[in-house]
Design a protein with these regions (language model features):
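C-terminal catalytic domains of large/alpha subunits in multi-subunit enzymes
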Residues: 4-144
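Glycine-rich phosphate-binding loop
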Residues: 1
Length: 144
């Protein structure tokens, strides 16, 4: 099927964030990992579909694809430390920060990978079907 031929695979991931002083580094790292996983899901997998009456068609885990552990690479996470001056602990928020840059980074990587085929745009999520369609459309434009 298309999923095998047009498989997208994230093979490496590095992130660096500034959360000020880290009160509990293990919890912060978990938040970053969760955010990255969420961003990968948004960019490559998670796709809601509705029927003509507005009924959600992807309402179960059988129909709505989310990342599993085997969809994700190991994450390399680093931190800079610029303490916040607005609170006594010098901390900043870290909840799901990894989800901010993940989708555009992945979509740009997909477009870069497909650029030799003439693909210049890709909407999220970059499912195998959307990758196939983008390739077909770029090839039909090139043939004109």
């Amino acid at each position: 099927g298309l999923g095998d031929v047009y498989k997208r695979q994230v093979v490496d991931w590095a992130a660096c964030d500034d959360f000020g002083n880290l009160v509990n580094p293990m919890i912060v790292e978990g938040q970053v990992h969760g955010g990255i996983a969420q961003g990968i899901g948004q960019a490559l997998l998670e796709d809601a579909h509705y029927d003509e009456n507005g009924q959600l068609l992807t309402a179960s885990y059988m129909d709505y694809c989310m990342p599993r552990a085997d969809d994700l690479p190991s994450f390399k996470v680093g931190y800079t430390n610029t303490p916040c001056t607005h609170n006594d602990l010098g901390v900043k928020g870290c909840g799901e920060a990894g989800a901010i840059a993940s989708p555009p980074a992945l979509i740009n990587a997909v477009i870069d990978a497909l650029s030799p085929l003439g693909v210049t745009d890709m909407s999220m999520p970059a499912t195998p079907q959307k990758v196939w369609k983008a390739i077909q459309e770029s090839q039909s434009v090139a043939a004109e």
